[in-house]
Amino acid sequence: MENNKELEKVAYEYQVVQAQAQLLAQNLELLSLAQAEVQTVKETLENLMKIEDENPEILVPIGAGSFLKGKIVDKNNAIISVGSGYAVEKTLEDAIKYLDERIKEYDEAIRKTQEALNELQKRAAELAKKAQEIQQKQAMSFKLKK
């Protein structure tokens, strides 16, 4: 009977750990997507700096895979999101430096999240092994009682 309670406890903890791991995996995916978006913005600004034309033509996305043609009127400055719905105008150089910092922050958050996920996965494996041992004990005691 004690083995049943212990097995229930281990199974419950395993479910909790699995749920936490799933949340961290989703977090990791969101962090990676956000980092990729910031990286794309940085690369776009770097490429803009290489263009010699003072007012290069661009395509402006308007949704549903549709675009309007436009011209950049100020290719020396960019308006960059700084979070919480705020954006500031920065020179391209400053914007790129700022985006580099954001990418480093994402790298660190991804690293920490991956470490936490690895720990949870290790704990889940330990719990699965423990549950299997309890089940084996139950099977052995059942055979002995016969």
UniProtKB/Swiss-Prot annotation:
Single Gene Ontology BP annotation: protein folding
Keyword annotations of the record: Chaperone, Cytoplasm
The keyword Chaperone belongs to this UniProt entry's keyword annotation: yes
A Pfam family reported for this protein in Swiss-Prot or TrEMBL: Prefoldin
Transmembrane portions of the chain: none
Matching Gene3D superfamilies: 1.10.287.370
Protein origin, superkingdom: Archaea
GO annotation, cellular component aspect: cytoplasm; prefoldin complex
Gene Ontology MF term list: unfolded protein binding
Subcellular location: Cytoplasm
NCBIfam families per record: prefoldin subunit alpha
Quaternary structure, from the entry: Heterohexamer of two alpha and four beta subunits.
Functional summary from the UniProt entry: Molecular chaperone capable of stabilizing a range of proteins. Seems to fulfill an ATP-independent, HSP70-like function in archaeal de novo protein folding.
PANTHER family assigned to the protein according to its UniProt record, in alphabetical order: PREFOLDIN SUBUNIT 5
Family under the similarity heading: Belongs to the prefoldin subunit alpha family.
Annotated protein name in UniProt: Prefoldin subunit alpha
Species: Pyrococcus furiosus (strain ATCC 43587 / DSM 3638 / JCM 8422 / Vc1)
